[in-house]
From Swiss-Prot:
Probable serine/threonine-protein kinase required for the completion of molting. Its EC number is 2.7.11.34. The gene is nekl-3. It comes from Caenorhabditis elegans. This is Serine/threonine-protein kinase nekl-3. SUPFAM superfamilies: Protein kinase-like (PK-like). ATP binds at residues 29-37, 52.
């Protein structure tokens, strides 16, 4: 049994014995409205984890408390190499603590900033290498009827081995087979779909919009709807009207530019299915991979 299984199966200690005393907090690695995330060492097994501490009783809003508990339920259902893994949860010192897989190297936003600071674009081969892993993670989530609702570079973690881990499901929502849409304005404005801004109800296609925005940002090194002097109103109008600069045709492939434009469509029903996005990503990653035949033009059948 590996180290991860030891903690995941609660072999030692049992779940009702978990407490903050069993973790050595090393440093803070993230902060949210109601939470802080720390790099921590488990004392009973040689394993570093991300310990997310949520101030449960400071959340006077009942919905916020439910969202935190919902995050735990969602994570229990997910088991994929490209999704941050849930290990355990417990309440200690009036805090809800969630023990998560640690992604050491950082996140996609850090990688984008690195290239932007260096005045370089991310090579398309590299874009597909990471994007295909995100597409796999999203396909797994959607197959479980789970929507992420906050896909953005800062929530796409990258390990030291170059493995993508989609995380931060605090805004996730479980969709039963009878549920067709959700009505709550949450998420990051730059990546929010028109239907979410208009609060007209949305479904899994909103994740595809955000995924298209992320793919665009990997290529352009900035959000498609970014502006130097923008307020929330002007941002929302740009999103609703799908006003964004096209990616340069002389730098990026037709397939990449086409996938972006298909995901960033105002009408959710016209966006591709998650399976289609994954198919394109797999095809393009195979084309750009070292073992691929670089002399062959990539297919445009998608």
């Amino acid at each position: 049994m590996d180290k991860i299984s030891n903690i995941y199966n609660f072999d030692d200690p049992p779940p009702d014995k978990l407490s903050l005393e069993l973790f050595i907090i090393e440093k803070k690695i993230g902060k949210g409205q109601f939470s802080e995330v720390f790099r921590a060492q488990c004392t009973w097994v040689d394993l570093h984890v991300a310990l997310k501490k949520i101030q449960v009783f400071e959340m006077v809003d009942q919905k916020a408390r439910q969202d935190c508990l919902k995050e735990i339920d969602l994570l229990k259902q997910l088991n994929h190499v490209n999704v941050i893994r849930y290990y355990a949860s417990f309440i200690d010192n009036n805090q809800l603590n969630i023990v998560l897989e640690l992604a050491e190297a950082g996140d996609m936003s850090r990688m984008i900033k690195h290239f932007k600071k260096g005045g370089r674009l991310i090579p398309e081969k590299t874009i597909w290498k990471y994007f295909v892993q995100l597409a796999r993670a999203l396909a797994h989530m959607h197959s479980k009827r789970i929507m992420h609702r906050d896909i953005k570079p800062a929530n796409v973690f990258i390990t030291g081995n170059g493995i993508v881990k989609l995380g931060d499901l605090g805004l996730g929502r479980f969709f039963s087979s009878k549920t067709t849409a959700a009505h709550s304005l949450v998420g990051t404005p730059y990546y929010m779909s028109p239907e979410r801004i208009q609060e007209s109800g949305y479904n899994f296609k909103s994740d595809l919009w955000s995924t298209g925005c992320l793919l665009y940002e990997m290529a352009a090194l900035q959000s498609p709807f970014y502006g130097d002097k923008m307020n929330l109103y002007s941002l929302c109008k740009k999103i609703e009207n799908c006003e964004y600069p096209p990616l340069p045709a002389d730098i990026y492939s037709t397939q990449l530019r086409d996938l972006v434009s298909r995901c960033i469509l105002p009408e959710a029903s016209k966006r591709p299915e998650t399976s289609e996005v994954l198919q394109v990503a797999e095809h393009m990653n195979n084309y750009f991979s070292p073992s691929g035949d670089q002399s062959t033009t990539p297919s445009t059948q998608f």
